[in-house]
């Protein structure tokens, strides 16, 4: 299949069908067993892999947070820009939660995010992926732990901010992918 810049696509299928493996190949994390992955007409290789990966914002289903502040987890340990931080906090629907905290975005999350709910961790991961303004945004069942209302708000915001981005979504809820240009079913490792 071909994925064009700015296109929104989704992969659906049963657990174990190969959706995540396919996306790992598209991100250059796994080499394909056969065939090739072309980026702008060039084979994805060791020479261009690092540059390609820098264009990707990835939101996994299983989130890892380190024992530091919300802000530093979003900026992934880098020095952070307050305006950019505020922007992604809003985009990830975190502002009311952060406002309710005594220390705001400077609140410690605890080891592995132990002080947070699964939904709060997912929203922090979404903010992290958006922080560096990636050209390609990959959501691997990234909203699965959210309630329907939170998921709808976040997906609406993701579609809005990804109007000029390529969006790749693995989802189990069809309402998550209703705005995609193409939807691919993955079965037994085949599209």
Regions found by a protein language model. Give the residues of each.
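ABC-type nucleotide-binding domain
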Residues: 1-191
């Amino acid at each position: 299949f071909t994925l064009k810049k700015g296109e929104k696509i989704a992969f659906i299928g049963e657990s174990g069908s190969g959706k995540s493996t396919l996306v790992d190949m598209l991100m250059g994390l796994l080499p394909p067993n056969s065939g090739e992955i072309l980026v702008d007409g060039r084979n994805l290789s060791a020479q261009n892999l690092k540059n390609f990966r820098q264009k990707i914002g990835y939101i996994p289903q299983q989130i890892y947070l380190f024992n530091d502040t919300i802000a530093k987890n979003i900026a992934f340990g880098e020095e952070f820009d307050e305006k950019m931080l505020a922007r992604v906090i809003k985009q990830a629907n975190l502002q009311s939660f952060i406002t309710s905290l005594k220390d705001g975005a400077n609140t410690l999350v605890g080891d592995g995010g132990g002080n947070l709910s699964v939904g709060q961790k997912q929203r922090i991961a979404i903010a992290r992926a958006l922080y560096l303004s990636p050209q390609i945004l990959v959501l691997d069942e990234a909203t699965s732990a959210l309630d329907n209302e939170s998921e709808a708000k976040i997906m609406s915001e993701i579609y809005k901010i990804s109007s000029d981005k390529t969006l790749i979504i693995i989802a189990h809820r069809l309402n998550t992918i209703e705005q995609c240009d193409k939807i691919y079913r993955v079965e037994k490792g085949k599209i």
